[in-house]
Amino acid sequence: VIEALLAPGAIRIADIGAAFLGEAPPYQSLLDNGLGHVFAFEPDARQVDTLRARLGAKGTVIAEAVGDGARHTLHVCNYGWSSLLEPDPAALAFFNSFAALGRVETTLPVTTRRLDDIAELPPVDFLKMDVQGAELMVLQNGRRKLGTCVVVQLETSFVTLYKGQPPFGAVDLEMRAQGFIPHRFMDIKRWSIAPALIGGDPRVAGNQLLESDIVYVRDLIHGTLNDDQLRKLAAIAHFACRSPDLAARCLIELGKRGVLEDSAVLSYLTAQGLKR
């Protein structure tokens, strides 16, 4: 049902901080089903060739840092920890094993590009972002490109690990100001507090909240989405967010508008074990 709603490659995905860390990105099923094209931004030169090989024709790799358009210092750390912000030694020392992971190996001067200024990037439908503390900077400088975006998935920190890093609350306020509401946590990461080890293993999580991948969606409660936005939100909800109830809401609305046959809506609901 959902695949028939969209032309091949219709969903425009932006992945900011696209380094491959051993896990498939949340939009992988959209690519596998021919529904999306990803613009992958990654300033770490160690990752660029791998990204190009993995994405092939389904992606465009842009080896640049996204930010506020100003010149910054890229702090190159272990994979997954590199950031435009400097790691905070006090925060790292609070958690077991983080001091080594957040050790800065080298620094590089980089000139960032504002999302709104990137001509080769079309308006974004689905933004995935993992930029180690620079999320708010990117969002504030990408309001035009995100004007019709329907889903944003980003990593946000409950405890900040970088100097000057905005906490979860500041990012949440910006997302709401741009017309999004929280939809779900894809995961919530906890970690053990140093120096005590649980079972002697630093990888065993304690109770301290650390960070989470959170999904925001365009506000369906107070806002009106056009047909194209509803189609894309249904596809992203189903294939990337594992949210059949959200996809169903979009399909039912498309049915009310005469865009989708009632039988197609019923077919999806039945397949997902849902009832009206």
Over which residues does each language-model region extend?
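Phosphate/nucleotide-binding beta-alpha loop and adjacent structural elements of enzyme active sites
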Residues: V1-R276
